[in-house]
Amino acid sequence: MSLVSESHAEELVRGAGQLGIPLDDRQQRLLLAYLALLIKWNKAYNLTAVRDPDEMVSRHLLDSLSVVPFVAERGRNWLDVGSGGGMPGVPLAIMFPERAFTLLDSNGKKTRFLTQVKLELKLANLEVVHARVEQFQPSTAFDGITSRAFSSLEDFASWTRHLGNAETRWLAMKGVQPDDELQRLPEDFRLDACHVLKVPGCQGQRHLLILRRTS
């Protein structure tokens, strides 16, 4: 029996349309193939607390796709920190095959899963790194750095400071707007923008906070 049903495909296409993000055949096929791998591996690897496959389209795929317009603005070299099961990094790599995405996680089980995703989906623009973020030392700064349910804004900024520069945008996906966390931002970071995300099928508040370095 297929792990991904026709209703999952319909929900994905419908939800992406509501987000204003039409999917071509390749994008739809790869997103559903990724969903099937996530469902399969989650049983043994505990990649996500969402156990019900019927919830994964909205809570993982559509939630990840909600930041596509902001990634589309600019930046060819992206880092997804604490990528876990690959959200939002894998869906973004599928949507932007001409851009490079590095998925970073310190959990070996999760990076093994992400490596399998890269191989099976043939995502040449995806790199998987098994390391702690503080110890990751790439040769060049990233244009954009994403996180989803990773840490506080203070830690996100502090731990990834060395991975960006004054041109880098830090995109933090959050639930309710974290006003208390914003008060504790490092002095060399500022809030550039805050966007309310409307994710089809997701209850509760969703926000995207875009941070920039001030120096």
From Swiss-Prot:
GO cellular component: cytosol
MF terms (GO), sorted A to Z: rRNA (guanine-N7-)-methyltransferase activity
Domain of life: Bacteria
Transmembrane segments: none
Gene3D superfamilies: Vaccinia Virus protein VP39 (3.40.50.150)
Catalytic activity: guanosine(527) in 16S rRNA + S-adenosyl-L-methionine = N(7)-methylguanosine(527) in 16S rRNA + S-adenosyl-L-homocysteine
Keyword Transcription attributed: no
Signal sequence range: none
Alphabetized UniProt keyword annotations: Cytoplasm, Methyltransferase, rRNA processing, S-adenosyl-L-methionine, Transferase
Amino acids binding S-adenosyl-L-methionine: 82, 87, 133-134, 148
Subcellular location(s) of the protein: Cytoplasm
Principal location class: cytoplasm
Pfam family, one: GidB
EC number: 2.1.1.170
PANTHER family: S-ADENOSYL-L-METHIONINE-DEPENDENT METHYLTRANSFERASES SUPERFAMILY PROTEIN
Annotated family: Belongs to the methyltransferase superfamily. RNA methyltransferase RsmG family.
Role: Specifically methylates the N7 position of guanine in position 527 of 16S rRNA.
Name of protein: Ribosomal RNA small subunit methyltransferase G
Annotated organism of origin: Stutzerimonas stutzeri (strain A1501)
Gene: rsmG
